């Protein structure tokens, strides 16, 4: 078999009381499916997933519903050998929030190469939006890791990207906030860091 079919879903309910507004109930759920190539030896690889995400705030200051149709895709092509490849990843969101509908598109073209003791990724993050201020943003997507010994590595990264501010993300920040509509997404132009990691086992290290 060269293709793997994936399907799944989630359902979540959060009930709590907030003084002056009484009982709140936040309901979230999603249904998703996708296809993925499952032969690493093939030159062309792909991973395509589509999800329908539902969210509702009931008994809140102003009950709201949010529906998102999200499509993620990642296509890669191996170059001269398995150690290097080029690819492009994307996420397209079609958002439906009460009477306001808009779409966002995030593209991530990249080049990746690895050797016995180092890995390199050179890419860019391109963010577009329609019916949402018609925004265009660009940021780097760079990562370099160099293994100096068996249990230590030097790393350098510079990245960025869209910061989503839908109802789901806002609930994670503060479920008690008085939110009447999702905020516009932000965009991180640059987040750069350089450091040194060391540790005896995977998952336990200092940096």
Residue ranges and their predicted role:
Residues 1, 23-31, 63-71, 101-105, ...:
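Residues that define the transmembrane beta-barrel architecture of outer-membrane proteins
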Residues 1-45, 51-68, 97:
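Flexible loop and strand-edge segments within Gram-negative outer membrane beta-barrel domains
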Residues 3-9, 44-50, 69, 83-88, ...:
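Transmembrane beta-strands of outer-membrane beta-barrel proteins
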Residues 11-17, 39-41, 52-58, 81, ...:
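Transmembrane beta-strands of outer-membrane beta-barrel pores
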Residues 19-25, 36-38, 57-63, 75, ...:
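Outer-membrane beta-barrel proteins
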Residues 47, 64-70, 74-114, 119, ...:
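Beta-strand-dominated lipid-handling architectures at cellular/organellar boundaries
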Residues 100, 114, 119-207:
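Exposed, low-structure sequence patches enriched in small/polar residues
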């Amino acid at each position: 078999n060269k293709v793997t079919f994936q399907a799944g879903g989630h359902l979540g309910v959060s009930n709590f009381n907030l003084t002056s507004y009484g009982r709140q109930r936040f309901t979230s759920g999603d249904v998703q499916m996708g296809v993925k190539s499952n032969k690493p030896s093939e030159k062309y690889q792909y991973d395509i997933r589509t999800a329908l995400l539902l969210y509702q705030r009931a008994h809140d200051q102003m009950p709201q519903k949010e529906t998102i149709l999200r499509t993620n895709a990642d296509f890669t092509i191996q170059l001269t050998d398995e150690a290097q490849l080029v690819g492009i990843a994307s996420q397209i969101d079609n958002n439906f929030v009460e009477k306001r509908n808009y779409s966002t598109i995030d593209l991530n073209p990249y080049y990746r190469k690895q050797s016995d003791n180092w890995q390199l990724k050179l890419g860019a993050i391109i963010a577009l939006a329609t019916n949402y201020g018609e925004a265009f943003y660009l940021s780097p997507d760079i990562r370099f890791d160099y293994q100096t010994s068996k249990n230590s590595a030097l790393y350098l990264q510079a990245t960025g990207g869209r910061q989503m501010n839908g109802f789901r993300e806002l609930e994670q920040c503060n479920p008690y906030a008085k939110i009447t509509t999702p905020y516009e997404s932000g965009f991180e132009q640059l987040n750069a860091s350089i450091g040194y990691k060391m540790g005896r086992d995977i998952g336990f290290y200092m940096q």
